[in-house]
């Protein structure tokens, strides 16, 4: 734009420059008079005015054509108000971008936290620890820990986790109204996730679980996934002959069969038979794990309904806590766990290996003592303490899987 303006001004300059000789020619050829429009003084004044105009235009052209250096400094010296305005605009734009990025970051973190709650992390941790512990039982020496074994373990774990998310997600989809009373912080009950989002997540993880199982080619793993799918669906889906969670015995049976029997037997067989290519044979630790986890899974199935008694009663869920009352169910759960720990201590004492005997006896004794002390401060009317105690039972569940490999 400056180049075009300079060219136009240069053309005008040439035109005005040519007017100088015309003025002189007219001065020599025109008859002069001392009065009137063509007086010498007036004519000379016009020529002088034209010359002055030419000089000003030439100066303007030179200024426009001259390259600007240190534009920032010139803007600062000549136009301080303009530079202040530019700085303010830049600051506003940077601040707006930073705020927008912070909002996006906050939204992403919020969605991740909601997804974390959607997965029911205490069940995820239980699945990870349980499958890891059971997968170690067939190992006889350090030579068994190979890349093939690691791949087989990861296939089983990933497929099981995807199925776990399907089961807990499906339960939340059918329990939205109940969870608004019992667990209002869950993403579907709170409205953080829409029903469409929940359906998408449930179907996606179901497909991933079966895809991994089929790709592995493991019959025990596929058996575990299919049974988990069937029982998890029957537990939650509202349909004739389904929605087994309405009935205390059927609900407890679903949880007990999956957590106590299926996890131990199916994943042990997967590692022993499919991965290590050894004949399937039960071990002392496998039998102990199955029997002990039957007791523990029954406790989890019964105790989980104590915090939910209000919502279950309102929606016709006939859990044992609704029928017998939370206090009686709580006392039953504590009795079952203490009995199981006593039996585990006797099993550990029968071990021929001194180190394993010390670990199993002292470990189960310490867990039983911790449970008894914690039970002294339990208040069934205090919702916060009931929920906290339920999560404490899950921690005992995790701890037991660390002791199971030492039972030989």
Swiss-Prot record:
MF terms in GO: homogentisate geranylgeranyltransferase activity
EC class of the enzyme, as a word: transferase
Protein's UniProt keywords contain Transmembrane: yes
BP-aspect Gene Ontology terms: vitamin E biosynthetic process
Keywords of this entry: Chloroplast, Membrane, Plastid, Transferase, Transit peptide, Transmembrane, Transmembrane helix
Catalytic activity from the UniProt record: homogentisate + (2E,6E,10E)-geranylgeranyl diphosphate + H(+) = 6-geranylgeranyl-2-methylbenzene-1,4-diol + CO2 + diphosphate
An annotated GO cellular component: chloroplast membrane
Any one Pfam family match given in the protein's UniProt record, by short name: UbiA
E.C. number: 2.5.1.116
Residue range of the transit peptide in the UniProt record, numbered on this chain: 1-62
Pathway the protein contributes to: Cofactor biosynthesis; tocopherol biosynthesis
CDD domains in the record: PT_UbiA_HPT1
UniProt-annotated location(s): Plastid, Chloroplast membrane
PANTHER family, alphabetized: HOMOGENTISATE GERANYLGERANYLTRANSFERASE, CHLOROPLASTIC, HOMOGENTISATE SOLANESYLTRANSFERASE, CHLOROPLASTIC
Family named by the database record: Belongs to the UbiA prenyltransferase family.
Further information: Seeds of most monocots are enriched in tocotrienols and contain only small amounts of tocopherols.
Protein's name in the database: Homogentisate geranylgeranyltransferase
Organism expressing this protein natively: Hordeum vulgare (Barley)
Gene behind this protein: HGGT
């Amino acid at each position: 734009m400056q180049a075009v303006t300079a060219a136009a001004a240069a053309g005008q300059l040439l035109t005005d420059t040519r007017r100088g000789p015309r003025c002189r020619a007219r001065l020599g050829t025109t008859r002069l008079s001392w009065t009137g429009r063509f007086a010498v003084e007036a004519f000379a004044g016009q020529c002088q005015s034209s010359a002055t105009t030419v000089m000003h235009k030439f100066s303007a052209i030179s200024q426009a054509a001259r390259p600007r250096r240190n534009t920032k400094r010139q803007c600062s010296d000549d136009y301080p108000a303009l530079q202040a305005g530019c700085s303010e605009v830049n600051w506003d734009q940077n601040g707006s971008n930073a705020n927008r990025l912070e909002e996006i970051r906050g939204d992403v973190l919020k969605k991740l936290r909601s997804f974390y709650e959607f997965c029911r992390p205490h069940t995820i941790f239980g699945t990870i620890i349980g499958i890891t512990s059971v997968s170690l039982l067939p190992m006889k020496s350090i030579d068994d820990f190979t890349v093939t074994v690691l791949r087989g373990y990861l296939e089983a774990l990933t497929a099981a986790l995807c199925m776990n998310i399907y089961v807990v997600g499906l339960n939340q989809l059918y329990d939205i109204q109940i969870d608004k009373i019992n667990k209002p912080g869950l993403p579907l009950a709170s409205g953080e996730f829409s029903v469409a989002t929940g359906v998408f997540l449930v179907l996606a993880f179901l497909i991933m679980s079966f895809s991994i199982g089929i790709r592995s080619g493991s019959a025990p793993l596929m058996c575990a996934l299919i049974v988990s799918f069937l029982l998890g669906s029957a537990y939650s889906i509202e349909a004739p002959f389904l929605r087994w969670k309405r009935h205390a015995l059927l609900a407890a049976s679903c949880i007990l069969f999956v957590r106590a029997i299926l996890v131990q037997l199916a994943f042990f067989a997967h590692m022993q038979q499919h991965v290590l290519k050894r004949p399937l044979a039960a071990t002392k630790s496998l039998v102990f794990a199955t029997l002990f986890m039957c007791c523990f899974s029954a406790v989890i199935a019964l105790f989980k309904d104590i915090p939910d008694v209000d919502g279950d009663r309102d929606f016709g869920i006939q859990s044992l806590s609704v029928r017998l009352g939370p206090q009686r169910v709580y006392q039953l759960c504590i009795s079952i766990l203490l009995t199981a720990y006593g039996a585990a201590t006797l099993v550990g004492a029968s071990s021929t290996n001194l180190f394993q005997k010390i670990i199993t006896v002292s470990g189960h004794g310490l867990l039983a003592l911790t449970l008894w002390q914690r039970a002294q401060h339990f208040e069934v009317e205090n919702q916060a303490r009931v929920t906290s105690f339920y999560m404490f039972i899950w921690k005992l569940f995790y701890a037991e899987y660390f002791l199971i490999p030492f039972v030989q």
